[in-house]
């Protein structure tokens, strides 16, 4: 057991899907995995291990933001020897051609978080996806008839920004979408020499102001889940 994850040795698979919402983790386990067993309920952050097409896979909620995700990723890697981490979550579109429910695969993640500034003594680090997982996800999406958008995203620490137009600068430089975790995930994956990828579904658009409901975000954004499960090793 680790501090925040109550699993015993060998209860977590080498590939873990990482939704921010623990209820989404529960939904995925109940609707996609066979023989799913709950290994964690600490702080209500559900974790399950089961099988998808014969492959052993875990799904672990992380909570919102880089600090919360970093706790779970550190413990999954260092206490449970996890090798493949696939974040599945929602994002806000920053581009007019990226619509609600589109799939975004994060090739890299810019960030306004200070966490890497502190880690790298004020210098800039470029958090980047595992090419192995990225290529597999892109190829699988195309095979499934899903056209993903692939590129740089923004990981932000601020959900409610005092400047409602701050996103426009990032959009000008081609950033596809905004969320709150990926830069932390990719940095830790690089630090510990494991593979990580983020696959996102667009839940709202900063360009048009459109948005989906909370219930829809929890239960119907399943193309990203299918892609993630299909590339699990």
UniProtKB/Swiss-Prot annotation:
<feature type="binding site" description="in other chain">
    <location>
        <begin position="179"/>
        <end position="181"/>
    </location>
    <ligand>
        <name>a purine D-ribonucleoside</name>
    </ligand>
</feature>
<feature type="active site" description="Proton donor">
    <location>
        <position position="204"/>
    </location>
</feature>
<dbReference type="InterPro" id="IPR018016">
    <property type="entry name" value="Nucleoside_phosphorylase_CS"/>
</dbReference>
<feature type="binding site">
    <location>
        <position position="4"/>
    </location>
    <ligand>
        <name>a purine D-ribonucleoside</name>
    </ligand>
</feature>
<dbReference type="GO" id="GO:0006152">
    <property type="term" value="P:purine nucleoside catabolic process"/>
</dbReference>
<comment type="subunit">
    <text>Homohexamer; trimer of homodimers.</text>
</comment>
<feature type="binding site">
    <location>
        <position position="43"/>
    </location>
    <ligand>
        <name>phosphate</name>
    </ligand>
</feature>
<dbReference type="InterPro" id="IPR000845">
    <property type="entry name" value="Nucleoside_phosphorylase_d"/>
</dbReference>
<feature type="binding site" description="in other chain">
    <location>
        <position position="20"/>
    </location>
    <ligand>
        <name>phosphate</name>
    </ligand>
</feature>
<dbReference type="Pfam" id="PF01048">
    <property type="entry name" value="PNP_UDP_1"/>
</dbReference>
<dbReference type="InterPro" id="IPR035994">
    <property type="entry name" value="Nucleoside_phosphorylase_sf"/>
</dbReference>
<feature type="site" description="Important for catalytic activity">
    <location>
        <position position="217"/>
    </location>
</feature>
<comment type="similarity">
    <text>Belongs to the PNP/UDP phosphorylase family.</text>
</comment>
<dbReference type="GO" id="GO:0005829">
    <property type="term" value="C:cytosol"/>
</dbReference>
<keyword id="KW-0808">Transferase</keyword>
<keyword id="KW-0328">Glycosyltransferase</keyword>
<protein>
    <recommendedName>
        <fullName>Purine nucleoside phosphorylase DeoD-type</fullName>
        <ecNumber>2.4.2.1</ecNumber>
    </recommendedName>
</protein>
<dbReference type="GO" id="GO:0004731">
    <property type="term" value="F:purine-nucleoside phosphorylase activity"/>
</dbReference>
<comment type="function">
    <text>Catalyzes the reversible phosphorolytic breakdown of the N-glycosidic bond in the beta-(deoxy)ribonucleoside molecules, with the formation of the corresponding free purine bases and pentose-1-phosphate.</text>
</comment>
<feature type="binding site" description="in other chain">
    <location>
        <position position="24"/>
    </location>
    <ligand>
        <name>phosphate</name>
    </ligand>
</feature>
<feature type="binding site" description="in other chain">
    <location>
        <begin position="87"/>
        <end position="90"/>
    </location>
    <ligand>
        <name>phosphate</name>
    </ligand>
</feature>
<dbReference type="InterPro" id="IPR004402">
    <property type="entry name" value="DeoD-type"/>
</dbReference>
<feature type="binding site" description="in other chain">
    <location>
        <begin position="203"/>
        <end position="204"/>
    </location>
    <ligand>
        <name>a purine D-ribonucleoside</name>
    </ligand>
</feature>
